[in-house]
Amino acid sequence: MAKKIDGYIKLQVPAGKANPSPPIGPALGQKGVNIMAFCKEFNAATSNQEPGLPIPTEITVYSDKSFTFIMKSPPAAYLLRKAAGIAKGSGTPNTAKVGKVDRAQLEDIVKTKDADLTAADLDAAVRTIAGTARSMGITVEGV
């Protein structure tokens, strides 16, 4: 018989840097999950990724306090900031442009996020990421 699901927890955890301090500890502690076990498993699973890369993680907690987790691809906004070489997006994206990306950089981001995007083809996915870039005040070239 399948385990009974007690709840879900969604967190953005830096790759290789999961530790019991907030926000991870309190979120897992509320559900009674072994915090150190999660931290060790997560850090082992993300050991091959760039340290500090934010990884959206969905943790499924079962009634016996065991857990499983699914890691998604990093947020598009983070990847765009990294590609454009900026610290943060523009406060007024329509008037103040803060960086620039081209189609090749957008295609690299789409390949990174491929599993999480629902676009029908590469061109549609590139346009989706380009829209995110424009809303952050990043100039998009070649799209």
Curated annotation (Swiss-Prot):
GO terms for biological process: translation. Keywords: Methylation, Ribonucleoprotein, Ribosomal protein, RNA-binding, rRNA-binding. The keyword Oxidoreductase does not apply. GO terms for cellular component: cytosolic large ribosomal subunit. GO terms for molecular function: large ribosomal subunit rRNA binding; structural constituent of ribosome. CDD domains: Ribosomal_L11. One or more lysine residues are methylated. Gene3D superfamilies: Ribosomal protein L11, C-terminal domain, Ribosomal protein L11/L12, N-terminal domain. PROSITE patterns: RIBOSOMAL_L11. Belongs to the universal ribosomal protein uL11 family. Forms part of the ribosomal stalk which helps the ribosome interact with GTP-bound translation factors. Part of the ribosomal stalk of the 50S ribosomal subunit. Interacts with L10 and the large rRNA to form the base of the stalk. L10 forms an elongated spine to which L12 dimers bind in a sequential fashion forming a multimeric L10(L12)X complex. This is Large ribosomal subunit protein uL11. It comes from Psychrobacter cryohalolentis (strain ATCC BAA-1226 / DSM 17306 / VKM B-2378 / K5). The lineage of its organism: Bacteria, Pseudomonadati, Pseudomonadota, Gammaproteobacteria, Moraxellales.
